């Protein structure tokens, strides 16, 4: 299936749901930001696995429910805490540990394994009866032959962040290395501010869009006999169709 098909389907699912999607992203971002400034390093790692992990899983689950037209609410963001909390913490820990261990060997194998494990949390949502390792194994099996496609899909979002990131970098360089020149310092400051504002604005749009696209990718590749678990999606018809009741 084409990259554009996944992205078109994601936009279709978000149609009329942008408000709740952006609101959930804001809440997720605020909570994650608070957890990201701990008093010490050990507290950071504890909070990351006990709170950030289930929160991230709930954020993915929200978008999976979104593409299935289940009208998810803010409470879905916290479903990683209310549904199999300990399993979700352990799953987040294991996926991150496995990925880090592969990254310690080489960057490329680490990226490949990260792609292989990327469907784990979606699988845990659809199949709560499976163990963590079964979900990881199922994700690896599902991504067999699909990793390149997902990698290209992820790369297609990069242009959105390149320009604001470049403005931020240029601004920082100008501020720190040309402080003696008031004109260049002013240019650097303006560039930094514009880059930060653009980055925030783009993130508000991009994160719900990206995560919804990831959910579409999963739902389009999950092997299931239950039609309610997958969208009606083809290259010829890239719009998700809301099921009739």
Task: Describe the predicted segments one by one.
Residues 1-245:
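Hydrophobic alpha-helical membrane segments
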């Amino acid at each position: 299936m084409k990259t554009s098909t996944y992205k078109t389907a994601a936009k279709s699912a978000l149609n009329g749901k942008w408000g709740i999607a952006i609101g959930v992203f804001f809440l997720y971002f605020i909570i994650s930001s608070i957890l990201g400034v701990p008093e010490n390093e050990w507290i950071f790692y504890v909070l990351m696995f006990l709170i950030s992990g289930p929160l991230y899983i709930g954020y993915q689950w929200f978008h999976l429910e979104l593409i299935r037209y289940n009208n998810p609410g803010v409470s879905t963001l916290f479903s990683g805490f209310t549904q199999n909390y300990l399993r979700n913490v352990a799953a987040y820990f294991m996926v991150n540990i496995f990925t880090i261990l592969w990254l310690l060997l080489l960057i490329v194998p680490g990226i490949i394994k990260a792609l292989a494990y990327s469907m784990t949390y979606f699988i845990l949502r659809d199949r709560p009866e499976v163990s963590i390792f079964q979900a990881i194994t199922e994700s690896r099996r599902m991504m067999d032959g699909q990793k390149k496609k997902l990698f290209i899909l992820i790369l297609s979002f990069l242009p959105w962040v390149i320009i604001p990131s470049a403005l931020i970098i240029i601004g920082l360089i100008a501020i720190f290395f040309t402080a003696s020149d008031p004109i260049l310092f002013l240019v650097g400051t303006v560039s930094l501010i514009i880059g930060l504002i653009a980055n925030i604005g783009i993130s508000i749009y991009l994160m719900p869009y990206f995560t919804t696209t990831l959910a579409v990718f999963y739902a389009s590749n999950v092997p299931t006999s239950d039609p309610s678990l997958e969208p009606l999606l083809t290259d010829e018809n890239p719009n998700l169709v809301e099921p009739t009741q």
